[in-house]
Amino acid sequence: ETQEAKARRTSLDYMVVGIPVGKVGIGFGLIPYSSVGYKIGRTAYVTNNNNDTIRSIISRYNGIGGVNKVFLGFGYRLTKNINIGGDLQYNFGTIETKSLQYQTDLQYGSRENNVSDLRGVNFDLGITYQTKVNSKYSFFSSLAYTPEAALNSGNTRNIEIVQLLSTSAVSVIERQNISVEDTKIKLPS
């Protein structure tokens, strides 16, 4: 018996475009800023004095999402040796985490779901200096400044009573939305 499988995958991790026009340069793009991706499972066994399993405690932790930034940059050549520039960035994304606890000797387990919707604006400024030291060597120096900025995080949370099915899927029995505050995440300068 033979089996045949085919798979195709296409992904675009980032896109950046730079356009030089004389003394001016313009750039724009979309770049991932951070990424969350994990799936952890653990089963602990509770035993009696005879080392017989009384129950299993199943724990699952999942996290997906991330933050991306779209930016527009501008650079200008002041002199033959000095360039200045800056860019404006808009950060956006969603991070979702889930935590499941289930004991096999109980009918139901619990799952906590958290979602953070992140948004924010920041900018960078920079200057570069470059000159020839001699015919073989060049000297290059740069200075960049990024002021402190913040990501606004709109947060939601719910707690669910769940039943673990024989297929390892989860059936939601009841859901309770929990009020959580929105937060600001500081991006240091």
Please place each PLM-identified region on the residue numbering.
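Subset of outer-membrane beta-barrel
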Residues: 1-189
